Amino acid sequence: MSNKLVLVLNCGSSSLKFAVIDAQTGDDQISGLAECFGLEDSRIKWKINGEKHESSLGAFTAHREAVEFIVNKILAGQPELAAQIQAVGHRIVHGGEKFTRSVIIDEHVIKGIEECSSLAPLHNPAHLIGIRAAIASFPKLPQVAVFDTAFHQSMPERAFIYALPYKLYREHGIRRYGMHGTSHLFVSREAAKVLNKPLEETNVICAHLGNGASVTAVKGGKSVDTSMGLTPLEGLVMGTRCGDLDPSIIYHLVHQLGYTLEEVNNLMNKQSGLLGISELTNDCRGIEEGYADGHKGATLALEIFCYRLAKYIASYTVPLGRLDAVVFTGGIGENSDIIREKVLNMLQIFNFHVDSERNKAARFGKKGIITTDNSTVAMVIPTNEEWVIAEDSIKLITK
């Protein structure tokens, strides 16, 4: 067993994903999910060596109780494995401009994450709860913060500044930050290996497609543009998020249709996207089933999703100058051969030609090139954000 194990925590507002990761191989020794925090049926599910387990956490429990369960029940039952854990790595959604790389957590870092909470009000406060719970449960282990936004700090001003009065950026930090950076970092790095090219000479466009979705142009291993903005709302059509729209729609909804700003925010974040267009579901699998059955709303939602994605991919050839590959990842990107084929068919001007057999084979955790031999390359690479967090954690504590 490796002596480079890291407990990785990803705290959401009402859930906590966790895994014990081998930083050398990326393999998970333990993985699990605690969910339904604050409700009567809070539960925790986990897997050890392929064997599944489940337990109740008790009514109205939350992050601290979940971390305590991980320590006192799960890890206590695996003493040899627990003894090999070298650090606790935390996924943090928003680091603003304060954090351009992963850092060992101290009071200064905690304060910085708190100050960025206004940019990610649903996520950063939950991360802080998880950090404090982990410090209490693992007082002797170093704690490491890995930021989703850090990878995008290499973007030039022309990519991240909005065409608003510049003082809004200077005084209030209003700019494009981007998300999913840890995923884009991992898959762009893996794409260079598939292409057999040095990372610093590789130009790829990465599409992380899940209930949240974003596209990033990666030039020589660095993010040069990305679709999400100040918040995760900008960019692609997503499960329940609208992505790009005319900002005056907000004014129209408030002043002409009587919506409150809170209602508009809820509408754009939780009632739009695939769900809003289809009037059926936010789940892409349900959208594809509806499409196959001729459901009009599902068909329209699928077409808009693919069209928006194809437009973004096409536009990101501009900052790259030369395109080596398009990379699909995330739950939808890794599993939907239908969406991949539709998107690439819209991009035939860039010499993309789908190989149907390869495309259908690259699902359910399998990676590979999905285009023909004479085509511009498109590939599927399953993401592994936990591995990046584990790697960064070990690198920091062994400096």
Swiss-Prot record:
<keyword id="KW-0808">Transferase</keyword>
<feature type="binding site">
    <location>
        <begin position="331"/>
        <end position="335"/>
    </location>
    <ligand>
        <name>ATP</name>
    </ligand>
</feature>
<keyword id="KW-0067">ATP-binding</keyword>
<dbReference type="GO" id="GO:0006085">
    <property type="term" value="P:acetyl-CoA biosynthetic process"/>
</dbReference>
<keyword id="KW-0460">Magnesium</keyword>
<keyword id="KW-0479">Metal-binding</keyword>
<dbReference type="GO" id="GO:0006083">
    <property type="term" value="P:acetate metabolic process"/>
</dbReference>
<feature type="binding site">
    <location>
        <begin position="283"/>
        <end position="285"/>
    </location>
    <ligand>
        <name>ATP</name>
    </ligand>
</feature>
<feature type="binding site">
    <location>
        <position position="385"/>
    </location>
    <ligand>
        <name>Mg(2+)</name>
    </ligand>
</feature>
<protein>
    <recommendedName>
        <fullName>Acetate kinase</fullName>
        <ecNumber>2.7.2.1</ecNumber>
    </recommendedName>
</protein>
<dbReference type="Pfam" id="PF00871">
    <property type="entry name" value="Acetate_kinase"/>
</dbReference>
<feature type="site" description="Transition state stabilizer">
    <location>
        <position position="180"/>
    </location>
</feature>
<dbReference type="GO" id="GO:0005524">
    <property type="term" value="F:ATP binding"/>
</dbReference>
<keyword id="KW-0547">Nucleotide-binding</keyword>
<feature type="binding site">
    <location>
        <position position="10"/>
    </location>
    <ligand>
        <name>Mg(2+)</name>
    </ligand>
</feature>
<dbReference type="InterPro" id="IPR000890">
    <property type="entry name" value="Aliphatic_acid_kin_short-chain"/>
</dbReference>
<keyword id="KW-0418">Kinase</keyword>
<comment type="pathway">
    <text>Metabolic intermediate biosynthesis; acetyl-CoA biosynthesis; acetyl-CoA from acetate: step 1/2.</text>
</comment>
<comment type="subunit">
    <text>Homodimer.</text>
</comment>
<dbReference type="GO" id="GO:0000287">
    <property type="term" value="F:magnesium ion binding"/>
</dbReference>
<dbReference type="InterPro" id="IPR023865">
    <property type="entry name" value="Aliphatic_acid_kinase_CS"/>
</dbReference>
<dbReference type="GO" id="GO:0008776">
    <property type="term" value="F:acetate kinase activity"/>
</dbReference>
<dbReference type="GO" id="GO:0005829">
    <property type="term" value="C:cytosol"/>
</dbReference>
<dbReference type="InterPro" id="IPR004372">
    <property type="entry name" value="Ac/propionate_kinase"/>
</dbReference>
<feature type="binding site">
    <location>
        <begin position="208"/>
        <end position="212"/>
    </location>
    <ligand>
        <name>ATP</name>
    </ligand>
</feature>
<dbReference type="InterPro" id="IPR043129">
    <property type="entry name" value="ATPase_NBD"/>
</dbReference>
<feature type="site" description="Transition state stabilizer">
    <location>
        <position position="241"/>
    </location>
</feature>
<feature type="binding site">
    <location>
        <position position="17"/>
    </location>
    <ligand>
        <name>ATP</name>
    </ligand>
</feature>
<feature type="binding site">
    <location>
        <position position="91"/>
    </location>
    <ligand>
        <name>substrate</name>
    </ligand>
</feature>
<keyword id="KW-0963">Cytoplasm</keyword>
<comment type="function">
    <text>Catalyzes the formation of acetyl phosphate from acetate and ATP. Can also catalyze the reverse reaction.</text>
</comment>
<comment type="similarity">
    <text>Belongs to the acetokinase family.</text>
</comment>
<feature type="active site" description="Proton donor/acceptor">
    <location>
        <position position="148"/>
    </location>
</feature>
